[in-house]
Amino acid sequence: MKGSNDNSSRRLGVGFIGSGFNARFHMLGWKGVREGDVLGVWSPNKKNAASAAEYARSLDVGNAKAYASITDMVADPAIDAIWLTGPNQARIENVEEIVHAIESGKGSLVGIACEKPLARNVAEAKRVVELVKRVGLQQGYLENQVFSPQVEAGKELLWARGAATTGRPYLARAAEEHSGPHMPWFWQGALQGGGVLNDMMCHSALVVRHLLTKPGQPLATVTPKRVTAHIASLKWSRPDYAKRLSKSMGKDVDYTKSPSEDFASTTIEFETDDGQTVIGEASTSWSFVGAGLRLSAELLGPEYSMSWNTLDSGLKLFFSREVRGKAGEDLVEKQNAEVGLMPVVANEAVAYGYEAEDRHFCRVFLGKEKPKLTFDDGLEVVKILMTAYQSAEQGKTLEFPPRGLDKFVPAVAKGTWKPR
């Protein structure tokens, strides 16, 4: 596609930075993307890169191959855009290599999409934005939940029928909850940039703002004014569970000495463009034990409401205690049981919004749509997250944005936070 003036029938060649759980979820969602192909994977772990490329080929979503370096992938004329899905701590390094490859004339791209969060703190997020804008790339901020078909349909219908006749919605709630992430780096505050607030509140904080924003209007029409947050380590710093965690994730994860928060709640007061106050309540947890991952949202107005819960999937299976089998995640992500009455999320990549967001950003980079979310939106999310950490640390409500936000690093990320 590079250099083409007619993108109407062209397909976007996409390369992935990252080969883990998130990258594979995107690849699974790619089965519903007609505008692009997964053609490349780079990871510092060559074996994992090769495995992820093989996985993409097995799904028939592109003739993917593993690359020896990010520069090699950018230099390949078949690669038009990069999807950044690697660990948070590698974000700056990865983007710098992309930009250097472009500026040195080794390759070119039309766009770059970045998985949430954009970066670990405001300073790093601003650096990512500056680098990408310096080389004139189109941007896509990958926040799958706002692309969930249930979220989109619920929002559109409530605004069209309820808000149009009785007034705009005034309260939105969103939550993501499960029993903990797959990889050790997520649990290490210094690497990840925090705990569950940084890892998953980025979803919920944006979902509530998205729901409160009138369809077709920019997020800026609903402006954050005040933030109140709480964080806690409810489960994983308990001695028995800290020991289990260290055993499963390795000696570098020790929640008796350097815990991260496994629960966070945030209330965001917004002001609308017509001067009304509306509220967003966001919560997130690594200490939720249910059937598996639970995403939920609500939107409430004067005479209407909506609710969404991914575990209300419509399909349930029952297994008696006589059924024996290996532990797995074949019923639902972050699955916690294999017996009893269990919900099944039949197509998680669709239900959670991966398919729709990847299709959208392929179309954006082909010039067929305007981006719903850019890196500027990702930066705004990071600002809200860092304000939430400040509020939790200070134990009070803060005006948004607070002073010193650009230089702020959470105590969890410094390794100095102690649960109360």
Label each region the model flagged.
Residues 2-8, 36, 59, 81-83, ...:
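C-terminal helix-rich "cap/oligomerization" subdomain common to oxidoreductases
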Residues 184-292, 376, 380:
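Rossmann-like dinucleotide-binding domain that binds NAD(P)(H)
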Residues 85, 283-284, 298-301:
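Short, well-ordered coil/turn residues at beta-beta hairpins
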